[in-house]
Amino acid sequence: MTTPLPAKPARQTAAFTLIELLVAVALALIILFAASSLLISSSRSSSDLQVRNDLLQEQQIAQNYLIANLREAAYVYPQGTTLNLGSGVTTQRPGGGAWVVGSSTAPILAIVKAPELPVSGCSASNDRACYKFKAYYPVVRATWVSGVGAASQNNPGADPSNETSWLLVEYTKNLVQTTPPTITQLTDLAPVGLNGESGKLLLDYVQPAVTGLPPLFEVPAAGPQAAGQTRVTVNLSVSRAASGKIVAVPARASTDPATWVQPVLVAPRNVGRLTP
């Protein structure tokens, strides 16, 4: 008679309970959410940094160009001067009305730049020998974009988040004459003889005027001008709304608009040489 083999014990297999599965799923979701938040935050930080770098580079280029022209000025139109630059969209003053040097709400810098070559050779085909009237002023971004035409090289493109931002514009008119202008002639040109040209886009996303913000340009009062004594202050600040945040250059360490600029003081080297 054979002895039956002893029965093998039943093999137990490990299994997750419903509660354990729910806990595991919850932990996985938490980890996924944290990783997603980190990725989004990193992406936004990278985007903000790119916007800031772009603003900084464009501001520096425009500011250096403006300052280089200002240093060569033979005359700076003083506070209180009314300028007629025409009625086109590229010369449209924020808020309307006439351009007045010294305005804080719609600032304008107007100069006459000395020629690179002897003025005796000035002609329509040789403008390097001509004195040049130059003005720098803001135009509301939405006004400019809608008015210059989509195909224009001067059109930076629509940006609904920044429609009220300013563009900094350069306006140039050659003074075609073979002798240096007098101060009286330049003064007489201001209300009637400087229109007929179009402004060119110099810088995008310029900070509009707000209470407490230093004016974009601070120019001398009326009176004799002399090299080393006549000075102009440029208070250039740029800001852009991007991804729900304001990115500004210079960076804003305070909510006080008085701290939003880094003033640059410029002394034109050719003033005082023109006869009254």
Locate predicted features:
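Short, conserved loop/turn and helix-capping segments at secondary-structure boundaries
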Residues: 56, 60, 87, 91, ...
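Short, glycine/small-hydrophobic-rich surface segments
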Residues: 72-109
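Intrinsically disordered, low-complexity regions enriched in Pro/Ser/Thr/Gly and acidic residues
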Residues: 104-106, 110-264, 268-276
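Aliphatic-rich helix starts adjacent to a transmembrane/signal segment
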Residues: 2-67, 71, 75
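Intrinsically disordered regulatory regions flanking bHLH/HLH domains
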Residues: 53, 100-101, 114
